[in-house]
Curated annotation (Swiss-Prot):
GO terms for cellular component: cytoplasm; nucleus. This is Restriction of telomere capping protein 5. Residues 318-544 form the TLDc domain. Belongs to the RTC5 family. Keywords: Cytoplasm. The gene is rtc5. PROSITE patterns: TLDC. May be involved in a process influencing telomere capping. The keyword Ribonucleoprotein does not apply. One of its GO terms (biological process) is response to oxidative stress. It comes from the Eukaryota. InterPro entries: TLDc_dom. It is found in: Cytoplasm.
Length: 599
């Protein structure tokens, strides 16, 4: 009888709603300051719609409050993501209504504050974000290859994706924090269907990520309307297409599967979602909080205005723009880029020569970013055309690899992050392990530096062996042997970018079978390819602030003073005619420039 009584007194298990409330309370206590919680409550109170005395947020309300531009068409995508994450950790209950507790959970997860509560081995939210954007439709995810010989491989890939989506570590960590055992039924609920992010939906979301990338705390998405109008909008779409191409081949599949999603982010876009933190932290700053209010009878001065924001890109270039800057921030720290870049060299303005490049760039004593864009050379007509193209083709090894993509006369954009000051190279290259070779257009890709092969960067002036001059990344430096000096063929590295000395042509090589040289092979394009292109523009941007720019200006000023002093040599006589006669005797001026005699 005692056993029966003890069983009757055992508390009933908590419902999903009660567990969600408990998790929200844990997050609120551990992840927010009292002021942030107060602000969130005030914001929610001002935005919430009510039904039966229950407040919640609608799609349009969230988009309007966050200043999401209508032109992107991303509001439904954002709302789907938020209502899915609001059901955390019971994701099978999604979509959830967006009450105050649900918004606490959403903001905690989207701003990475959950790391303060959940165990460290569950720090990655990539799987959660994928699920929040995905659709679960077997028909959508079935590729055309399933109808032919690719059926087995497609099924194996789908099985791998299902296995990868099982046992979400973040969900398990949340249940651990609650002291709750996750049922097997819930654990495998969403893995029973094919999960895929449709390409069009993901394109819109990438455009939003590009837009929010430079946001500061309390920053507004509408602070720069030029980014979503005219040329700015076109640049945003171009960058989004290049990034989407890394995830998806639309000719083969209509959407992005999880294994591809996680692989591309880990290898090429490690900071892709960082802009979501300031975006969702915007809920934590209430405009009703006025710290400028004084005592009784005083109020905030009506003449006080917020200081104008500094533009994220101070200078302009033919390659660099705000969207390219955001794209690079997905693999380079934002504190190196936003409001920190200065245009050091632009071929369009300074001339396409290594001399101009050296004069403008070599005095910058901080990291730099080189960008080069051009148009792909067509194999036949360009090879046999007039001009310098045939000479360029003759200087390269015979083509062994196909092009990286199928577009004719397609625009190509490559870049290199150079972590140390530039210098002339003779037998040894410079750069180091932090050097990054990357492609921005028409596909986003990354090639990180090797720690074993040191042939990272070479800057060789034109000499008696002109075919070996130029700027190269990943190519072996010139050898001292006579056979090498006599050779007219440039030695290309397995993964390399080469620009000729006139900055007229370039060549990018990706020898996947070699497994890389000074740079590792691509993690997302596991095949050989080569791009030969006519250069349209070259730019070098300095990473740094006012101190670096001041140091460079001082070096330039010193060189200008020295050059002027050498030009104005005072011969000491004060007699112009006598000085001229002396210079004529020395053979330095006049018609008899034969020099003087020591006899």
């Amino acid at each position: 009888m005692g056993q029966v009584l003890s069983e009757e007194r055992k508390p009933a298990p908590l419902s999903h709603e009660e567990l969600v409330k408990e998790l929200a309370n844990i997050f609120a206590d551990k992840c927010f300051t009292p002021l942030e919680l107060y602000s969130l409550k005030q914001v929610f109170k001002s935005l919430a719609h009510h039904e039966q005395h229950v407040g919640y947020l609608k799609e349009g309300t969230i988009a309007t409050y966050l200043n999401v531009p209508d032109i992107l068409g991303v509001s439904p995508v954002l709302f789907q993501m938020v209502t899915y994450i609001a059901a955390f950790p019971f994701l099978e209950d999604a979509p959830a209504f967006l009450g105050l507790q649900q918004m606490v959970i959403v903001i905690t997860l989207m701003t990475d504050r959950y790391r303060r509560v959940l165990r460290k081995d569950a720090a990655d939210k990539t799987k959660l974000l994928f699920k929040s954007l995905a659709v679960y439709d077997r028909k959508l995810s079935r590729p055309a290859a399933d109808m032919h010989s690719g059926l087995t491989n497609a099924r194996e890939q789908a099985g791998n994706d299902r296995q990868a989506l099982d046992n979400d570590e973040l969900v398990l960590a949340a249940f651990d924090a609650l002291g709750h055992v996750i049922p097997d039924k819930q654990q495998n609920m969403l893995a029973t269907h094919e999960a895929m992010i449709p390409g069009d939906k993901f394109r819109k979301f990438i455009m939003l990520l590009l837009l929010v990338a430079p946001l500061d705390p309390q920053g507004r998405l509408d602070s720069d309307p030029n980014r979503v109008t005219g040329t700015g909008l076109q640049c945003l779409r171009t960058a989004a297409e290049s990034i989407l191409a890394a995830f998806l081949d639309v000719e083969r599949k209509p959407g992005v599967e999880y294994l591809r999603f996680s692989k591309v982010i880990a290898s090429c876009l490690p900071f892709l979602f960082r802009g979501l933190t300031p975006l969702f932290e915007y809920f934590l700053f209430s405009e009703e909080l006025d710290f400028h209010k004084g005592k009784k009878g005083t109020s905030r001065s009506p003449t006080m205005f917020p200081e104008p924001e500094q533009p994220i890109l101070q200078d302009t270039g033919s390659i660099m723009n705000a969207s390219i800057l955001s794209q690079m921030s997905f693999f380079l720290p934002g504190n190196l880029l936003f409001r920190r870049l200065r245009l050091l060299y632009a071929g369009d303005e300074d001339g396409f020569s290594m001399g101009s490049f050296e004069a403008k760039v070599f005095k910058w004593k901080a990291p730099t970013i080189l960008l080069v864009c051009g148009t792909r050379l067509r194999d036949d007509s360009d090879h046999h055309s007039n001009g310098s193209a045939p000479a360029f083709w003759a200087s390269l090894p015979p083509r062994r690899f196909p092009r990286g993509s199928s577009g004719e006369a397609e625009r190509l954009t490559f870049g290199v992050y150079v972590p140390e000051p530039w210098k002339l190279t003779h037998r040894d290259c410079f750069g180091g392990e932090d050097t990054i070779l990357f492609q921005l257009e028409p596909i986003h890709d990354l090639f990180r530096a090797s720690s074993l092969n040191k042939d990272h960067i070479s800057f060789a002036r034109p000499s008696a062996s002109p075919s070996h001059a130029g700027v190269s990344f990943g190519c072996p430096p010139p050898r001292p042997s006579q056979a090498y000096r006599r050779s007219s063929i440039i030695a290309l590295g397995p993964v390399s970018l080469m620009l000729d000395s006139s900055f007229e042509f370039g060549c990018f090589t990706h020898d996947y079978a070699s497994k890389g040289g000074a740079f590792h092979t691509s993690m997302i394009r596991e095949y050989d390819f080569q791009e030969r292109f006519e250069i349209g523009s070259v730019e070098v941007w300095g990473c740094g602030g006012d101190e670096e720019a001041k140091d460079q200006a001082e070096r330039w000023a010193w060189e200008a003073r020295e050059a002027e002093a050498r030009r104005r040599i005072n011969l000491g006589t004060g007699d112009i005619e006598a000085d001229r006669a002396l210079l004529e005797m020395a053979g330095l001026i006049g018609s008899n420039r034969n020099g003087g005699s020591m006899a």
